[in-house]
């Protein structure tokens, strides 16, 4: 099993979360909420208001999201779903696990940091780096930039 950090439309309550729950794609089990240990720019950009984590470590904000344990089949599905490597790149980053853990999960004695895969954007229009940086994402958030799901495009 691999750990994947999701920060946008794949989180619980967001438009694409259903793909993580679909067993036909493989297995994905929620482990905990998490926060990046290093700042990154999380921006909302493009005509479909997509949340992008720009691969600019050290700039932006600490980003909150969710950590999932996924099997190889789900990881391959997510690569395809995220158009990796053409659009997103799957990289590794360190995430601090937060208090909201899965039922039955062991409580660590102290804050725990784990390495996770994340889908981020290494190449992007330069102006994206100047967009407002967010520390968390919600499609219905106060930013007013509602995500346009693939099925509506």
Curated annotation (Swiss-Prot):
It catalyses: epsilon-(gamma-L-glutamyl)-L-lysine = 5-oxo-L-proline + L-lysine. GO terms for molecular function: gamma-glutamylaminecyclotransferase activity. Keywords: Lyase. One of its GO terms (cellular component) is cytosol. One of its GO terms (biological process) is modified amino acid catabolic process. Its EC number is 4.3.2.8. Residues 130-153 are annotated as: Disordered. Pfam families: GGACT. Substrate binds at residues 7-10. The active site is at 82 (proton acceptor). Residues 132-153 have a biased composition (Basic and acidic residues). Contributes to degradation of proteins cross-linked by transglutaminases by degrading the cross-link between a lysine and a glutamic acid residue. Catalyzes the formation of 5-oxo-L-proline from L-gamma-glutamyl-L-epsilon-lysine. Inactive with L-gamma-glutamyl-alpha-amino acid substrates such as L-gamma-glutamyl-L-alpha-cysteine and L-gamma-glutamyl-L-alpha-alanine. Monomer. Belongs to the gamma-glutamylcyclotransferase family. This is Gamma-glutamylaminecyclotransferase. It comes from Homo sapiens. The gene is GGACT.
């Amino acid at each position: 099993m691999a750990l994947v950090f999701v920060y946008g439309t794949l989180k619980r309550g967001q438009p694409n979360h259903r793909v993580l729950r679909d067993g036909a794609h493989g297995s994905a089990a929620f482990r905990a909420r998490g926060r990046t240990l290093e700042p990154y720019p999380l921006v909302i950009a493009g005509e479909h208001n997509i949340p992008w984590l720009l691969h600019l470590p050290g700039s932006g904000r600490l980003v909150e999201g969710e950590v999932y344990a996924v099997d190889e089949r789900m990881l391959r599905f997510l690569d395809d779903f995220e158009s990796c490597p053409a659009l997103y790149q799957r990289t590794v980053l360190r995430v601090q696990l937060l208090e909201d853990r899965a039922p039955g999960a062991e409580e660590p004695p102290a804050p725990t940091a784990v390495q996770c895969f994340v889908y981020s954007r290494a190449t992007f229009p330069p102006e994206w780096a100047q967009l407002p940086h967010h520390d968390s994402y919600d499609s219905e958030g106060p930013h007013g930039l509602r995500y346009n799901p693939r099925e509506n495009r």
